[in-house]
Amino acid sequence: MTILASISSIGNVKSISKSNNFSSLSNSSLQSSNSIQCGCGGGSPLIGTVGNLVGGVLVGTGIILGTVVGTVNGVVGGLLSGPNCGCH
């Protein structure tokens, strides 16, 4: 009985450590978005603002958070794709 309890507690610790890794990465992505500016020209102001926020997060983290923001990347990327988009 104690062996099963220890195994289940080890599984819980692993899941907690994974969630902590994602939270720390999301914090770094928010910090990196302050230094990177992204946007698209010729669009509505609302779409431009969303492009600046989401673009900074995606560029700052790269592929590390691809699994977390994959859905957001697909939706926003389709809306913001165009020749006048860029980051600096």
Swiss-Prot record:
Full protein name: HssA/B-like protein 11
Organism the protein comes from: Dictyostelium discoideum (Social amoeba)
Segment forming the signal sequence: none
UniProt record, GO biological process: sorocarp development
Family named by the database record: Belongs to the hssA/B family.
Domain of life: Eukaryota
InterPro entries linked: HssA/B-related
Entry-linked Pfam families: Coiled
